[in-house]
C-alpha cells in the first residue's frame, strides 16, 4: 500500500475504506473494508467479469473474446492521488479509486480508467498533454419508487414545483439552496473543483462546470461528482439524475467536454501559432472529431435513452459540423484568447461514463492530428437546419463502433469487444419491454 494512503488514513482517523473502480456504465463498484485491513492489502482482487456487468445488473450470455473462460481475477492497485474522504458517511470513511491489472502486470484492456490512461500515453509520446473541462447537466426530481410513473420536478423552498424554462435564473437555483450548500461542501471535502453552477433550460435542470485541468484527474472528479450529487439530493428527499432524457417534454442533459492540447515542455497551446492564429493541429483536431465521433457514438451515448436526446427539436447536436461560438453545432469553438483556444464537444450525454467519454473525445482528436486531417468549413448558420448524421439508436451506434478499426486500434480491441458485447446485451433486454405507447396505439388499432 502506498505510504501516502497510509498517512491519509492515519491523519484523518479513517475507520473504513471504499476501494472503488468505475465499470462500463460509470458505476462505482468494489469492496468496503476496515481501514486496518485495507492498509495491509498488497493487491486486492475482483473477478474480471465486473466489466461485463450490464447497467441492469445482468451479464451477456456470450462473453467469448472479451474475457478468459475461467473468469480469472484481476488485481486492483490503489492510485494514491485519488484518496479522499467520503463526506456523507456516518463513520470516518475514505474512498480510493483503483487501476486494474492482470497477474502478469498487464493493464486490463477493458477497464475504462485504463483506456483513458492509454490515450493520454499516446499524447505524451508526442510531447502533448490534453487539458479538459467537463460540464455536467442533471435534473433534480421527486423520489420515484415506481418506474411506471413519469418523473416530476421537486418542490423547492417556495412550496411550488418549478414549471421550467428558467435558464440562468438565480432565484430558481436558490429554491434548492440547502441541497447545493451540502453539495458544495461535499465537493470541497473531496477536492472536486466546481467552477460554476447554473440553472439550465429544463424544470429543475442544473449544470456544473468543473475547473479545467489534467484529463485523468477531471475524469475522476466527474465520476465522483455524479455520486456526490446523488448523495446530496437524497439528503433532501430528492433524486439527482444524469439520464440523458429523463422528461419527455424537457431538454436532455449533456456532458460537454472542452478540450485543448499543450506542449509538455513549453506548456503553450499547440492549437495556436506564435502569432496567435489557429494552428494546423487545431484544425486537424477538429477534423478528427468530425470523422471519428459518428463511429464512436455508442461511447458518448451509451444507453437506449441517450438517443431520445438527439433531436433537431431539442437543444442538442444532430451532426458533427463545427462553428465559432455556435451552440447549434456538435463542435463549438468558444470565443477565447490564443492561450485558451479550445474545442467544445457537445455530443456526449450526461449519462456517459466520464472516463470513456473523455478518452473517446481525445482519441478522435488525436487521430485527426496524427493523420493531418482537414475539417469542413465552419458553419455560420444553424446546424439544426442540416441533415442528421449521427446514429439514431444504440443498436446502430454499437454496430458502427464494432466495425471501426481506427477506434479499436487507439482505444484497444479488448475494450471495444467488451463494450459492444455489453451494449448488445443491454439492447436485447430493452427490446423485451413493452412500452405504454405500444399498448396505447397498437392494442386496438392493429
Residue ranges and their predicted role:
Residues 131-139, 155-170, 190-210, 240-257, ...:
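Core alpha/beta catalytic barrel or barrel-like domain that forms the active/cofactor pocket
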Residues 149-158, 255-263, 320-322, 329-335:
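Short beta-strand elements
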Residues 167, 172-176, 180-194, 208-215, ...:
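Accessory "access/gating" subregions that flank catalytic or transport cores
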Residues 232, 238-239, 265-317, 321-446:
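Catalytic-core signal marking the mid-to-C-terminal active-site face
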Amino acid at each position: 500500500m502506498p505510504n501516502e494512503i497510509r498517512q491519509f488514513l492515519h491523519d484523518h482517523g479513517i475507520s473504513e475504506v471504499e476501494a472503488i473502480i468505475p465499470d462500463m456504465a460509470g458505476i462505482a463498484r468494489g469492496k468496503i473494508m476496515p481501514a486496518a485491513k485495507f492498509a495491509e492489502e498488497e493487491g486486492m482482487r475482483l473477478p474480471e467479469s465486473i466489466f461485463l456487468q450490464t447497467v441492469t445488473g445482468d451479464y451477456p450470455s456470450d462473453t467469448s473474446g472479451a474475457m478468459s473462460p475461467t473468469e480469472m481475477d484481476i488485481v486492483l492497485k490503489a492510485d494514491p492521488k485519488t484518496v479522499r474522504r467520503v463526506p456523507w458517511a456516518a463513520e470516518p470513511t475514505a474512498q480510493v479509486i483503483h487501476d486494474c491489472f492482470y497477474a502478469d502486470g498487464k493493464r486490463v484492456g477493458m477497464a475504462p480508467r485504463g483506456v483513458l490512461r492509454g490515450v493520454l500515453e499516446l499524447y505524451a509520446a508526442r510531447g502533448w498533454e490534453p487539458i479538459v473541462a467537463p460540464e455536467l447537466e442533471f435534473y433534480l426530481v421527486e423520489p420515484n419508487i415506481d418506474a411506471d410513473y413519469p418523473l416530476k420536478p421537486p418542490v423547492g423552498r417556495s412550496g411550488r414545483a418549478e414549471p421550467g424554462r428558467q435558464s440562468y435564473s438565480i432565484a430558481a437555483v436558490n429554491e434548492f439552496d440547502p441541497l447545493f450548500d451540502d453539495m458544495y461542501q461535499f465537493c470541497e471535502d473531496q477536492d472536486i473543483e466546481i467552477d460554476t453552477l447554473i440553472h439550465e433550460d429544463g424544470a429543475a435542470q442544473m449544470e456544473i462546470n468543473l475547473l479545467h485541468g489534467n484529463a485523468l484527474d477531471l475524469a475522476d472528479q466527474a465520476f465522483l461528482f455524479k455520486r456526490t450529487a446523488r448523495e446530496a439530493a437524497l439528503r433532501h428527499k430528492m433524486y439527482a439524475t444524469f439520464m440523458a432524457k429523463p422528461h419527455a417534454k424537457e431538454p436532455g442533459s449533456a456532458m460537454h467536454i472542452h478540450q485543448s492540447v499543450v506542449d509538455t515542455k513549453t506548456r503553450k497551446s499547440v492549437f495556436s501559432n506564435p502569432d496567435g492564429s489557429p494552428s494546423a493541429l487545431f484544425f486537424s483536431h477538429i477534423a478528427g472529431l468530425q470523422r471519428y465521433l459518428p463511429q464512436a457514438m455508442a461511447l458518448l451515448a451509451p444507453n437506449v435513452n441517450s438517443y431520445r436526446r438527439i433531436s433537431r427539436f431539442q437543444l442538442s447536436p444532430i451532426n458533427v459540423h463545427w462553428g465559432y461560438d455556435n451552440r447549434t453545432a456538435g463542435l463549438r469553438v468558444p470565443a477565447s484568447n490564443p492561450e485558451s483556444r479550445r474545442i467544445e464537444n457537445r455530443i456526449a450525454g450526461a449519462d456517459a461514463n466520464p472516463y470513456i467519454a473523455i478518452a473517446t473525445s481525445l482519441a478522435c482528436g488525436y487521430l485527426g492530428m496524427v493523420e493531418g486531417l482537414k475539417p469542413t468549413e465552419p458553419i455560420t448558420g444553424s446546424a439544426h437546419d442540416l441533415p442528421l448524421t449521427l446514429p439514431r439508436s444504440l443498436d446502430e451506434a454499437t454496430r458502427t463502433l464494432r466495425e471501426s478499426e481506427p477506434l479499436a486500434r487507439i482505444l484497444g480491441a479488448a475494450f471495444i469487444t467488451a463494450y459492444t458485447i455489453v451494449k448488445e446485451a443491454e439492447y436485447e433486454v430493452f427490446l423485451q419491454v413493452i412500452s405504454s405507447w405500444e399498448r396505447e396505439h397498437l392494442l386496438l388499432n392493429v
